[in-house]
Amino acid sequence: MAATGVDKDRPRAMTSTTYLGLLLVGIQVLGFVAAIHAVLTVRTAQGAIAWATSLVFMPYLTLLPYLVFGRSRFDAYIEARRQANREMHLAAAELDWRPWVEEALAARQVSGYKGLKALVRMTRTPTLANNRVRLLVNGEASFEAMFKAISAARQVILVQFFIVRDDALGQRLQQLLLERAANGVEVFFLYDAIGSHALPHRYVERLRQGGVQMHGFSTGSGMLNRFQVNFRNHRKVVVVDGECGFVGGHNVGVEYLGEKPPLAPWRDTHMELRGPAVACLQESFAEDWYWATHSLPPLILPPQYDSEGALCQVVASGPADAQETCSLFFVEMINAAHERVWITSPYFVPDEAVMAALRLAVLRGVDVRLLIPSRPDHRTVYAASSLYALEAIRAGVKVFRYQPGFLHQKVVLVDRDTAAVGSANLDNRSFRLNFEVMVVTVDEGFAGEVEAMLEADFAESLEFTPEDRRSVRRLQQLGMRVARLVSPIL
């Protein structure tokens, strides 16, 4: 009987072993298929080699991370963009678009535009003249301007942020939107589902019950898209009545007002935009809204434009683009510099193209400056940024660390007439994984304001010198290099 019991158990053990073997073979096959996919789709040779090798030899460890981090294009968004563009074209057919054409033609005559011709082809948006722009330094000025515009809204409010918090600032925004919705204003509120993961459901429900159309931007539509949590909508946009728009680095939370240690005071920059280019901000928002809801917000053009003003171009970028628009944007701005290029970013994890552009600018005799934080909000990213900063110093770039608090602004200044403000960081995440938006302005007056702002920031910063580079301990350098290994997904 004992032998009979053993005989009964033996097939069961063999069956379990067979299933385990089939599972391992299946994972190995999936790893091989994913490796082929990586070779065909990953945009950089280094990334393709790294993913393909690990997927072939360690599929049990790397298959799931590849589904999350490895895919560099948000394919489902591409089709949503096409459909949104078709519907926007129909909606815009009855509007008078002649000012767009007239301003685009006028823009080509501006001298500062000549060095940035590639931007138009990269972004699908025209370069438009006769815009009014205003620099908004730090949170108090930025939110005061945004809240004032929202309070005066008559028709439509578009709101988009990466992070929204249910704190004093978030509740103030909530109350303003509820008041405008109660007065018949259409309000559309888009937030990133991952960036705002801590936002309580009650915050969203109160707005919805008050008539605000509020949705989270998520990649969860479709089987494979559920794994694409690495793609985030990092844009910060507010548009009121199609007349004025706001873009920059601020999210909605009291830390952006400098009220949350240990990173306080918080250093950030926004800008206000009025004129034809606001329509491009509406288009960017509409594409994102269509992905989240399969519907479009109203498109509004003001009855007339100013007869003079600044040249502006909205540069919206993301993983749905055919090329790395954000990386190319920075390369184009750096290459356009003849006298100087000053860049400020909370993170400095550049790709090879941007590093090469910085080196070439130094060799051309351009004053190349980089302003980064002296305090980390993400230690791994900070370590990787520090290593790249050391390499930049070796190439002749002047690197400064902002001392008073955390520096979060994303600003580029080129020569005496060109500046850009927006949401894009100087890192791989913004280059290839995030949806970002920058506004390029060609105007000597605005560039002068940006220059004065950055000069004040440099005055409160310490330059990172070659002596500092030599004083970094070997253990610290090892940590920096380990951080750089994972920089493609930071």
UniProtKB/Swiss-Prot annotation:
Keyword hit for Repeat: yes
Question: What does the record give under GO molecular function?
Answer: cardiolipin synthase activity
Catalysed reactions listed for this entry: 2 a 1,2-diacyl-sn-glycero-3-phospho-(1'-sn-glycerol) = a cardiolipin + glycerol
Give the UniProt record's GO annotations in the biological process aspect.
cardiolipin biosynthetic process
Is Chloroplast included in the keywords of this UniProt record? Answer: no
Q: Mind telling me which GO cellular component terms the entry cites?
A: membrane; plasma membrane
E.C. numbers: 2.7.8.-
Its localization reads: Cell inner membrane
Mainly localized where?
A: membrane
Transmembrane stretches, start-end = 20-40, 49-69
Stretches assigned to the PLD phosphodiesterase domain: 229-256, 403-430
The record's annotation in InterPro entries points to: Cardiolipin_synthase, CL_synthase_A, PLD-like_dom, PLipase_D/transphosphatidylase
Enumerate the SMART domains for this protein: PLDc
What keywords appear on the UniProt entry? Answer: Cell inner membrane, Cell membrane, Lipid biosynthesis, Lipid metabolism, Membrane, Phospholipid biosynthesis, Phospholipid metabolism, Repeat, Transferase, Transmembrane, Transmembrane helix
Q: How does it sit in the membrane?
A: Multi-pass membrane protein
Report the protein's function: Catalyzes the reversible phosphatidyl group transfer from one phosphatidylglycerol molecule to another to form cardiolipin (CL) (diphosphatidylglycerol) and glycerol.
What PANTHER family does this protein map onto?
A: CARDIOLIPIN SYNTHASE, PHOSPHOLIPASE D
The record's section on HAMAP family has: Cardiolipin_synth_ClsA
What is this protein's name?
Cardiolipin synthase A
Organism, scientific name: Pseudomonas aeruginosa (strain ATCC 15692 / DSM 22644 / CIP 104116 / JCM 14847 / LMG 12228 / 1C / PRS 101 / PAO1)
Q: What is the lineage of its organism?
A: Bacteria, Pseudomonadati, Pseudomonadota, Gammaproteobacteria, Pseudomonadales
Q: Which gene encodes it?
A: clsA
